Structure formats: structure tokens, C-alpha cells
């Protein structure tokens, strides 16, 4: 009996050793090609695949919405100040978004853009730490140019998540930021032209006098329930890149520490007091070191109702690749708003990323990482299909 037992144990041991040896010879180490999901649509990524780079070469990374190159380059330079970007992701995101504020990117970020109905520019911004899940945000910030840096002070020096309006400005003053006008000759001319054209377009509905031909002041107009959908469609403000935009940025180091941030001056000719999606956690941006991060841009009044950045991160948590997560998140919105315009970038903790967009011709975004073919920083573009229940995606 003992001899029989020893023989069985010997056979099991031999089989285990053989299988282990076979696995070592037939299971290659993960490469960039096996790490990516979906079909590549850019030359840079195709070259990276052919080069057979390992997944570890995807990090560190900086990625942001739109072709805001200077912001990305600065964030990448800051991220690279330490090996692998360690302890620099927050600095990278804050300084990258701050660069866009100073450059007044597309006149939709920073001072001197998107005046509201009274001709004033106000700012929204947010920073989120994917390790602690802490957020610092400001909304409707007045007379302070450094919105993203004030948001950082909210994160680091208060137990709150968001400060708004004049009180946020007073907090900024207490933290050492100087008050100054955010109005420029360009933004003043923009507002004067708008008022000369009977305040068209605007964001009012179900009021009198008719907001399509008048500047107001307005009063509520009773609307029969049967006409509500008709009036909503008729009065919708056409959202486009030049009147409604955000920089959303994500930075990840080699240990998958993540920060995400946003900055914007909101919708042009907005009703004073309006806040969009950018400073709202889960809407404008969301980050979780266990999974990844996402940033959004587009029609913030619609997007904040669906928390698309949170949806994308949770889809990745459930196992979806970044591109599929971004698409799924946008489809949730599109089912309810066929005229919606927006885009989303999703990145997992390993540096794999995807983008989806709707309602535009195309959506450009900037990426800096070791996986670049002709250097770390490159512009990626995804084509969008507008006016149909369909989304083009690009995944890497």
C-alpha cells in the first residue's frame, strides 16, 4: 500500500513539474499588444504594437482633452521630475491645467472668456486624488484667475469638497490669491455683441417675454404639459467646442497613483450662478487608484445629470476596457439626448486608454507617455458621428 501511494505521489509531482515547465515556455510575458483592447486607429499606437513594448512602458502618463499641447507638455515635464513620476501626479495636473488658464485655451478656460449674461467671467475647477478619494473644487469663482490652484487649496487646507461664488473668492484671498478682474476687452466685446443681437442665443425657456427675441428681464410663463417637450427642444442652446469647453487632465505614475483635474470658464452667456459638470466629482472627472480615471468635456448641463466619468470608471472596475467604458458611459446620455455634444477619455491604472465622442466631427486629445513613437507627447484624434445613436471609439 505504501509503495502504491509513493508511486501515485511521484506521478503527480512529475505531472505538476511538466505542466509548470510547459507554462513557462508557452506563456509569454504580457506585451503592449496583449495589454491593449480594441482596434488601434492611430499610427503611433500601431508602431508601439509592432515594437512589442511591454505594458510597463505605458507609465507614467499624462492625458488631457483637446489639443492643449502646452498644458500637456508642462504636466509631463513636471511628472518626469521624479523617477516614474512618483509623488508628482498632483503637481502635474494642477500646473498643467493652470497653464491652460494662463493661456486662455480656446477662450473656454481661464479669464477673459465665456462671459455670462451680465458680462462677467467666472471659473470652475476641480482636483481629485485617486489614492484618498479626496476632492477640492471651486465653482462660480469670481475675480480670481488661478481656479485650479484654489481648488487644490480646498483639497489640502479644508475638510470640504467644494466652495462656491464670493465665499470661494474670500477663501482664495485668505490663502494668498489676489483679486483682479477676469474681464478682458475681448470678453467685453463678446458680451456687447451678444446684447446687441437681442441676447441670442441664451439658456432661458418657458418665460416671457419670448427669450428668442428679447433680453428680458423674464418672468415664468405657464406651459401646458403637452407642450413641454416641444418648448424644450425649441429653446435648446446649440453647444459647440468654441462656446462650451473644458480641460480635463489625468496623470498617473509608475505605481498607478492617479490625480485628475478640470478647469473651465463654463458656458458662454450662461445665466449668472450656473455651474456645469467640470467641478462635480464623477461628472467632470473621477479617479480611483484601484481602477483608473476618466475626464469629460462637452455640454455640462446634460453631462452632470449622468456622472459620465464615474460611470466610465465603474465600467472599468467591472472589467470593461477603457474604450468600451467610455462608449458605454456616453450611450447612457445619448439615449435621452440625441442632440447632445460631448467626449470622454478613460484610462485604467495600467495606462491603457480609450476615448469616445458624440455630436462633433472629431475629438482631439493629448497624450504623453513612454509609448510614443516619435517622442513622448503626441496628438490623438477620434472621429465622431453626430446626430445618430452611434459613437466612434478609439482604444489603446
Curated annotation (Swiss-Prot):
Keywords: Autocatalytic cleavage, Disulfide bond, Hydrolase, Protease, Signal. GO terms for molecular function: N4-(beta-N-acetylglucosaminyl)-L-asparaginase activity; peptidase activity. It holds the Pfam family Asparaginase_2. It comes from the Eukaryota. Its EC number is 3.5.1.26. The active site is at 246 (nucleophile). InterPro entries: Ntn_hydrolases_N (IPR029055), Peptidase_T2 (IPR000246). Residues 1-23 form the signal peptide. GO terms for cellular component: lysosome. GO terms for biological process: protein deglycosylation; proteolysis. Disulfide bonds join 100-105, 199-215, 357-384. The keyword Signal applies. Substrate binds at residues 274-277, 297-300. SUPFAM superfamilies: N-terminal nucleophile aminohydrolases (Ntn hydrolases) (SSF56235). Cleaved into an alpha and beta chain by autocatalysis; this activates the enzyme. The N-terminal residue of the beta subunit is responsible for the nucleophile hydrolase activity. It catalyses: N(4)-(beta-N-acetyl-D-glucosaminyl)-L-asparagine + H2O = N-acetyl-beta-D-glucosaminylamine + L-aspartate + H(+). Cleaves the GlcNAc-Asn bond which joins oligosaccharides to the peptide of asparagine-linked glycoproteins. Heterotetramer of two alpha and two beta chains arranged as a dimer of alpha/beta heterodimers. Belongs to the Ntn-hydrolase family. This is Putative N(4)-(beta-N-acetylglucosaminyl)-L-asparaginase GE19290. It comes from Drosophila yakuba (Fruit fly).
